[in-house]
């Protein structure tokens, strides 16, 4: 079942972002059930009520049903989802034209010095607009920028040093603010630089890809890759705010857009069945970049992510469930070489493998397997790993996965009806071996 999916073919492989269409112990076995809408805590019976009430939706959401034709988005008051972490809580602003609303960014700047970290693809599109948003009506603020090469293959210590070099050469002090302008790679590296520079400085996320907007910019995971494993070096470090200007998706290549949808689909599978069913009905609108549909999908994804992070910031339990498909997927990214497959593409293939293993364990029925395959295909994502991956490659790479404890690989698997999952190391090894053999060469 190895994949013939080719990076140079489908609208689908790393953060080759915008081009104009031109160690805390984790419990061994955590069962999680998350029913229906995140925005209605009273209807959710799978989480502790105290935890669910933490999620604050501070503005009106996008229309839920997308049967009508799309309407042109324009600058307006953003939807706001808050990540509740006590004194370190922060808002996620979501909407069109937000980079044209300077106050949203300026209220979160510390001091008078700002360093914008971006890449060679995003800089020509949005760097000037971002600098204007940071300085408009605020002449006391000075902005430096560092433009990094674009791609997952550059998410390493050598590239990270360029950020530190610029900060030190510019003599930035502890009251400066780092701003991440780009996709997940830029957000992860800028966040890690902010966590490390002078032992921690202010940090703002401006994600410009679907992947970053619905997942990586929220929750404070920062870091870089190591040749032996993805995201092995990093820190938990929360931003002051996340500003999601949905207009930035207008310049996102189709392949990058599809990659981000893998994380959107994940939320529905592990904790939000209603959202998954909505995606099944509205995937064509998402692929067509319908602004109303996309705003809703981003908002709903951020609500799910914020809810989990507010309960388990440092992944000591329930937050691990957000890694559905990631253990197999990270093995693919590492095995084929960083940058060959996009993160979402690898996660999609990994999700199919996790679902296959869940079925082999007798935890889900065939109909759910088929629904997962269908929605990923609709999203133009791969449903099996590349042909070059072998069983031994999977095993050796997954042996150093961050979720390994006491020599046991723990996985996120589906169990029961749609929207239910389990994070566990208590499974029949035979099922894992059978899945690996089914999807890769011996």
Swiss-Prot record:
InterPro entries noted in UniProt: Dehydroquinate_synthase, DHQ_synth_AroB, DHQS/DOIS_N, DHQS_C
Reaction catalysed by this enzyme: 7-phospho-2-dehydro-3-deoxy-D-arabino-heptonate = 3-dehydroquinate + phosphate
Inducing or repressing factors: Up-regulated by elicitor.
Tissue specificity annotation: Highly expressed in roots. Lower expression in stems, flowers and cotyledons. Barely detected in leaves.
SUPFAM superfamilies the UniProt entry points to: Dehydroquinate synthase-like
Binding site for a divalent metal cation: 263, 326, 343
PANTHER family linked to this entry: 3-DEHYDROQUINATE SYNTHASE, 3-DEHYDROQUINATE SYNTHASE, CHLOROPLASTIC
Record protein name field: 3-dehydroquinate synthase, chloroplastic
Organism whose genome encodes this protein: Solanum lycopersicum
